Swiss-Prot record:
Cofactor: Zn(2+)
Subcellular location: Cytoplasm
Top EC group: oxidoreductase
Entry annotated with the keyword Oxidoreductase: yes
Pathway: Membrane lipid metabolism; glycerophospholipid metabolism
Organism name: Saccharolobus islandicus (strain M.14.25 / Kamchatka #1)
Domain of life: Archaea
InterPro entries per record: G1P_dehydrogenase_arc (IPR023002), G1PDH (IPR032837), Glycerol_DH (IPR016205)
Protein name (Swiss-Prot/TrEMBL): Glycerol-1-phosphate dehydrogenase [NAD(P)+]
Record has ATP-binding as a keyword: no
GO molecular function: glycerol-1-phosphate dehydrogenase (NAD+) activity; glycerol-1-phosphate dehydrogenase (NADP+) activity; metal ion binding
Record-listed substrate binding positions: 124, 171, 255
HAMAP family, alphabetized: G1P_dehydrogenase_A
């Protein structure tokens, strides 16, 4: 398939290491980043990390802080109100997935650069030029701004709740399915397929898979491996110009569940469940994926996440409608109720 123009959006610099948050003013100097800054952060643990960042900014730096709890369009508007007031040179997103998504979308809408400073390795939005914002037409990722730089402090990331770390592993292993779906769409629909970006996404998944062997023994080494996999996955999306290499039928299932059960479940947890199910459909060894996830304490049953059997089955039957333009193993018609129930039981997602 011939593509007239292919735009690649990538970060300019990625900093990964231990206690590197204390060197933030050095990194900003290297990149020519100057105040005023608008710092977007959370209200609890992430606010404490933001305070550390503020302590290590250049002494004469001017900044404003806004705290958010969710990733909705209203949160984006709140950030934009402060943007108009402060007129910042750059936005700093210090937090988990929700904070970084709001920051990058606000940066995109206001033609500003932003720096991604993750406090948990929960999903690949750390790097990607796409954001998941509630309040838009559908629960899928929209075009946003790629980070100018990423500052990933392993000491900070290793202290994040284990549930968030596991969610990041689930999100990244899902790339195995995303790439299979992409290949299928290229073969059956003539969709553009990028070998290099697909390989990069698969490498991220393999790293996350390897991480399941390490994380229980050495949390810091495991988290470093995971954060590098998440960054690589985000880069793959930037190179592809879409979420295709990182989001397939496993994500469609996750988004479908989020419509039916919007609170209390992490995105990466749902992607992990979706990966097990879609691996079965693709003829991939789903049992190995399930066993590896289970060993790290990942919830591999719907009831572990407070989901009912009916919610899982319903999600499987509507998943293909979430992004009808994105062809996957689910096809155009999706799954019948009986097929969905059978698959969910065979893969032990429901009893």
């Amino acid at each position: 398939m011939n593509v007239k123009e292919h735009v690649i959006s990538l970060p300019r610099r990625v900093f990964v290491g231990h206690d590197i948050i204390y060197d933030i003013s050095i990194y900003f100097s290297q990149l020519g980043i100057t105040s005023p800054f608008l710092i977007v952060t959370g209200t609890k643990y992430t606010k404490k990390i933001a305070d550390k960042v503020i302590e290590n900014l250049p002494k004469d730096a001017k900044y404003e802080v806004i705290e958010i709890d969710t990733a909705t369009l209203d949160d984006v508007y709140k950030v934009e109100e402060v943007v108009k007031k402060v007129n910042p040179n750059i936005l700093l997103g210090i937090g988990g997935g929700k904070v970084i998504d709001v920051t990058k979308y606000a940066a995109f809408r206001n033609n500003l650069e932003f720096v991604s400073i993750p406090t948990s390795p929960s999903h690949d939005g750390i790097t990607s030029p796409f954001a998941s914002i509630k309040g838009l037409q559908k629960p899928v990722s929209v075009k946003a701004k790629e980070p100018l730089a990423i500052i990933a402090d392993i000491e900070i990331l290793s202290l994040s709740p284990r549930r968030l770390i596991n969610a990041g592993i689930g999100d990244t292993i899902g790339k195995i399915i995303a790439v299979r779906d992409w290949r299928l769409a290229a073969k059956l629909r003539g969709e553009y397929y990028g070998d290099y970006t697909a390989s990069l996404a698969l490498m991220s998944a393999k790293h996350a898979f390897q991480c399941t062997k390490i994380i229980n023994k050495d949390i810091k080494y495991g988290v470093r491996m995971l954060i590098e996999a998440l960054i690589s996955s985000g880069v793959a999306m930037g190179m592809a110009g879409s979420t295709r290499p990182a989001s397939g039928s496993e994500h469609l299932f996750a988004h479908a569940v989020e419509l039916l059960h919007p609170e209390g479940v992490l995105h990466g947890e749902l992607v992990g469940l979706g990966t097990i199910i879609m691996a079965y459909l693709h003829g991939i060894n789903w049992k190995i994926i399930r066993d590896r996830l289970k060993k790290i304490g990942f919830p591999v049953k719907a009831k572990d996440l407070g989901l009912s059997d009916e919610e899982v089955i319903k999600a499987l039957t509507i998943a293909h409608t979430i992004r009808p333009e994105r062809y996957t193993i689910l096809g155009d018609r999706g799954l019948t109720w009986s097929s969905a129930e059978k698959i969910a039981r065979v893969t032990k997602i429901i009893d």
